[in-house]
Amino acid sequence: MAYVATGYGTGRSVSAVKQNIDNYLRYYGRNQLSGFFLDEMGATSQHLAFYKQIYSYIKGLDEELRVIGNPGTLPVADYAGVADVLVTFEGKASDYTRFNPQDGNAWVYAKPNAAQAMLVHNATSCAAMQTAMRAAATARNNTGLVYATDLLYDFATNTGNPWANLPSYWTSLLGTVSALNRGTALPGC
């Protein structure tokens, strides 16, 4: 999966994003890439045309390339057509446990959970990570692609980088996801 920043639909041009995509394919080759992670994705109708162009471009290169879009929040429903997977939540673990897409977002439930993703940071313990994973597995959240880390980020001060390293409980995270997928007891922390 190749990372491409999109500047929320205003910070980069479509041609610059396409150039990034082309460079990844030229450097790594199609056989090394499963798709593209479009970060800093807009979430409003105002930027939808920008993402339609990018999605069409990627699928025109190869229909099998997977597109993961990261608005980090619930975008307007039409965004479901410009990514194969949408990150509908990016934030603190404590906020994710209260996350409820049901209000005004019926489109979320028309998609399989494999089309929804969450990125949780500040899950400072294995138990906090497991709470977030259990929340993702509920019908309410309908989220199939999950990641949690104990690394910290403070939005108010823009300090920390929760994506700099794998979490200290990486093995427990993998075991937790596996157990939830199988419907078995979660591993101990």
Regions found by a protein language model. Name each.
Residues 1-189:
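Glycan-processing catalytic domains of CAZymes
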